[in-house]
């Protein structure tokens, strides 16, 4: 048999992006992604119920205090840095998204074999795109209610009418960039884990654990970026105040002080 006729043998072979699938209702379901995302969701709901129970007891827990501190800090940072006052529901929603995405990212870091027993659900584009749509679609609905139809349509033509196609593309790109940014970073971590798993066992432990530490940090950063962009998108779409409100309050204060200032009396007269 000649060399050309010999079968091509790979030194290593890594399956990337494969999922455990099942057929149901004529659709293909990634049941591993569904399982891990449900696990993260159950943990988030459990934390919420626990904080609600401690709030009813009259003695707030450390977790509740931390959550309230995060919400207050987020609102304050957005208002002070950008002059935008976000709607009250935005910061709690962003913090909840942060915790959920963080748990989804960290599930893939849990010690396991190759392939992972519990792969990170955020390494599946279906979940990240769903999360992005969950953020963007309600944002447009809330923006339409806050601004009204006329003002909502008019903001696509700002600052000039020629910017209309650019503004439309920008809005269409928001869910895509949100989804791809999170997916790409977490998926690349899964690729690294798969490649490290091919190393000999006697040297695998060191790079594997070093990468898991890096992966933990990447999970935090990506969850934070997703939550931060959520806040910024809603801040611009549902802002109830900002510089305009501050100026209005300042003008109101000046006018009230002018009204309250006493009229000058003729010389020699006192009140």
Swiss-Prot record:
Organism: Acidothermus cellulolyticus (strain ATCC 43068 / DSM 8971 / 11B)
Subcellular location: Cell membrane
Subunit structure: F-type ATPases have 2 components, CF(1) - the catalytic core - and CF(0) - the membrane proton channel. CF(1) has five subunits: alpha(3), beta(3), gamma(1), delta(1), epsilon(1). CF(0) has three main subunits: a(1), b(2) and c(9-12). The alpha and beta chains form an alternating ring which encloses part of the gamma chain. CF(1) is attached to CF(0) by a central stalk formed by the gamma and epsilon chains, while a peripheral stalk is formed by the delta and b chains.
UniProt cross-references to CDD domains, sorted A to Z: ATP-synt_Fo_a_6
GO molecular function annotation: proton-transporting ATP synthase activity, rotational mechanism
Membrane-spanning residues: 31-51, 89-109, 124-144, 186-206, 216-236
Membrane topology: Multi-pass membrane protein
Name under which the protein is recorded: ATP synthase subunit a
RNA-binding among keywords: no
Primary subcellular site in the record, as a coarse category: membrane
Gene that this polypeptide is encoded by: atpB
Chain intervals for the UniProt region annotation (Disordered): 247-271
Function: Key component of the proton channel; it plays a direct role in the translocation of protons across the membrane.
């Amino acid at each position: 048999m000649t060399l050309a006729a010999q079968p091509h043998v790979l030194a290593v072979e890594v399956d990337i992006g494969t999922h455990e699938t099942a057929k149901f209702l004529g659709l293909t379901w990634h049941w591993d992604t569904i399982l891990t995302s449900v696990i993260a969701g159950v943990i988030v709901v459990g934390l919420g119920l626990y904080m609600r129970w401690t709030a009813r007891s009259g003695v707030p827990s450390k977790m509740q205090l931390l959550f309230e501190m995060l919400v207050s800090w987020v609102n304050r940072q957005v208002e002070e840095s950008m002059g935008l006052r976000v709607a009250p529901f935005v910061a709690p929603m962003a913090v909840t998204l942060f915790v959920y995405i963080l748990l989804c990212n960290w599930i893939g870091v849990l010690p396991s074999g190759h392939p992972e027993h519990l792969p990170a659900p955020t390494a599946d584009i279906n979940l990240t795109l769903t999360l992005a749509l969950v953020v963007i679609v309600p944002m447009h609905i809330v923006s339409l209610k806050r601004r009204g139809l006329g003002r909502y349509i008019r903001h696509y033509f700002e600052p000039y009418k020629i910017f209309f196609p650019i503004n439309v593309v920008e809005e269409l790109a928001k869910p895509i960039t949100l989804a791809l940014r999170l997916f790409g970073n977490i998926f690349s971590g899964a690729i690294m884990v798969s490649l490290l798993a091919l190393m000999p066992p006697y040297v695998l432990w060191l790079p594997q654990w070093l990468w898991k530490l890096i992966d933990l940090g990447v999970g935090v950063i990506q969850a934070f970026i997703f939550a931060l962009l959520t806040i910024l998108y809603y801040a611009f779409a549902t802002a109830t105040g900002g510089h305009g409100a501050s100026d209005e309050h300042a003008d109101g204060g000046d006018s009230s002080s002018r009204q309250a200032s006493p009229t000058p009396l003729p010389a020699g007269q006192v009140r």
